[in-house]
């Protein structure tokens, strides 16, 4: 990573912000303004659809695809974000793997606190399976809060008796609602995006009074990961959430899970979003694509109902 590249990223992330707490509407607008600046690959086909009763964005390579499906969960602290704000990440995974992706527009807090998001993502996965997608051809992926959902959706699916996906990829995941990781304090001021206060504020909206000491909220410290599929956890050394990934990786190894902890020095939260700007972002996405290509296989069974949405539900998202 050149100094010039890092300067561009720091300038973007450290823009002056309003003093004091911001409204949910302001948080959502600010996040959308930031994330829509990210570079999205060309040659993608985008279709708005529904999956498990929720809106979703279907992303495909424009030049034909391989047999594989990424179920993607966007970030945004469980309070903001959408499939559109994550399109750089979803699109880059699709472009690099040749797989299709469904990015789920799950319900957000504070209007819909825990466990609404997990209920939506599990329903989306169940809908994929019901449509004929083989679980060995599915990977869960997401960034930040969505990276946490990639893990907790897998937990909830396992506990519901569903067959598990072939792999999980989590970019800078949020995995500990107890906020007990040392990096929550040691990276304060180093992280150009988050402060403990900001993380705890959005976290409280998601919790809405729920006890954070439960596996679906704090898998890094409480989850039994027995039987989990292979996982790739990518995180930067400058993140408040660094220890969320390091502790989950340790729990996964203790449970016999095939896990790769991929730590990149000197980069911010969800640095993969800066593909085309940061060399490390492109390199990390390449590694994620290799990981997925090696672990996602299987076949597409007959009866792909997910592709047979009504015209009203399945319309081009391109302008």
Predicted regions and their residues:
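Short amphipathic alpha-helix adjacent to the substrate-entry channel of hydrolases
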Residues: 84-102
């Amino acid at each position: 990573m050149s100094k010039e590249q890092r300067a561009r990223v720091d300038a973007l992330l450290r823009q002056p912000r309003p003093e004091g707490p911001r409204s949910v509407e302001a948080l959502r607008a600010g996040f959308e303004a930031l994330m829509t600046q990210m570079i999205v690959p060309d040659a993608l086909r985008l279709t708005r659809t529904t999956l498990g009763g929720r809106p979703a964005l279907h992303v495909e390579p424009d030049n034909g695809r391989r047999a594989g499906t990424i179920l993607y969960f966007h970030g945004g602290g469980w309070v903001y974000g959408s499939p559109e704000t994550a399109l750089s990440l979803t699109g880059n995974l699709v472009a690099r793997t040749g797989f299709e992706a469904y990015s789920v527009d799950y319900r957000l807090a504070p209007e819909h606190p825990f466990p609404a998001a997990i209920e939506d993502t599990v329903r989306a996965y169940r809908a994929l399976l019901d449509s004929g997608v083989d679980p060995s051809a599915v990977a869960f992926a997401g960034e930040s809060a969505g990276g946490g959902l990639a893990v907790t959706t897998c937990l909830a699916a396992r506990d519901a008796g569903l067959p598990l996906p072939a792999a999980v990829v989590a970019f800078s995941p949020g995995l500990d609602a107890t906020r007990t990781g040392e990096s929550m304090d040691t990276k304060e001021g180093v992280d150009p995006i988050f402060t403990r206060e900001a993380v705890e504020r959005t976290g409280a909206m998601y919790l809405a009074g729920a006890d954070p000491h439960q596996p679906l909220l704090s898998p890094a410290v409480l989850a039994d990961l027995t039987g989990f599929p292979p996982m790739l956890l990518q995180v930067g050394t400058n993140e408040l959430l660094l220890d969320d990934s390091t502790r989950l990786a340790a729990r996964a190894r203790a449970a016999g899970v095939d896990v790769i902890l991929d730590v990149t020095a000197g980069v911010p939260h969800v640095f993969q979003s800066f593909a085309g700007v940061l060399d490390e972002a492109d390199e990390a996405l390449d590694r994620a694509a290799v990981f997925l290509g090696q672990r996602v296989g299987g076949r597409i069974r007959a009866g792909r109902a997910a592709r047979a949405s009504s015209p009203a539900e399945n319309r081009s998202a391109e302008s």
